[in-house]
Amino acid sequence: MKTFKPLAMIILLISLSCKSKQNTSVRQENLPAGKIVKNTAKGTLFIMGGGKISKSLIEELISTSNLKNDDFIVILPMASEEPDSASYYAKKSFVEVQVNPDKIKTFNLKKEQQSIYQIDSIKKASLVYITGGDQNLFMSQILHTPAYDAIHTAYLNGATIAGTSAGAAVMSREMITGIEYKHSQYSGNFRTIESENFEIKEGLGLMPSAIIDQHFIYRMRMNRLLSVVLEHPDKKAIGINESTAIIVHGDSAVVAGESQVIILKNPNKNSVKTKNGLLGGENILIDILLPGEKFKL
């Protein structure tokens, strides 16, 4: 009987490993560790808050990506319910700033259909661009796939990873899904600051120290971000307004575009309290940054 113990232990470990990957939807549970703990990546994140993206912001994105003759762009439109349309307009915006259309690849990836060519292209791209839409749709096709790893490889090796709207939300490890548990009838009007109200799922984890919200000032999402920073006091909560971006390299970032970025911090982690489902806290810090201003992550 003793000879079977090692085999039994292996089976047990495999079983536990599989169970740990099954549920990525959480409220207050800890998410699994992301690929990047400390930002040692050679690449850059170009995170846009959605809305109308100006030609000058696209030009800055292309400049940041430092595209050379043999370099190319990969567009990932899986967040959109109309990926062909999302790809068309993304490609059009790049061509309008003199990017050669032959240097632009589009992959509407499916979780179970990711070719070696597609994965290698993502790894070698100088710019990976994630369109807007629904961040949950995007992650449903990317999480625990070769494409997820390929995006991380590209970023670590020096690529620019860009996204707008939903493509911004996925940059976080703890990703705001947009789902409100307690008041779904409000349809995006975040009227309360309550505990366990906003769904958080696993994102790409390229920006593990912060949680991103987008369309921030225009859609009045302060209550949501306050709830997030109270329940996740170890993270910076960053609200990026429309037509605006943060450009992240290493542990530093700069604001670009036309509007502001709001940063919430909760340094007094032990001050968070709840009463009848309401969230409270003390000494929450807020920064309102203008285009050109820099901050540390």
Task: Please report, for each region that a protein language model flagged, where it lies by residue.
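Sec-dependent signal peptide recognition
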Residues: 2-9
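C-terminal motif of bacterial Sec signal peptides marking the signal peptidase cleavage site
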Residues: 16-17
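C-terminal and late-domain segments of enzyme folds
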Residues: 23-69, 84-89, 94-96, 177, ...
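Short internal beta-strands
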Residues: 72-78
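Portal/gating segments that form or line small-molecule/metal binding sites
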Residues: 81-124, 137
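Catalytic-core regions built around general acid/base machinery
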Residues: 121, 146-158
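Catalytic nucleophile loop
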Residues: 130-132, 155-176
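Glycine/threonine-rich flexible loop motifs
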Residues: 135-145
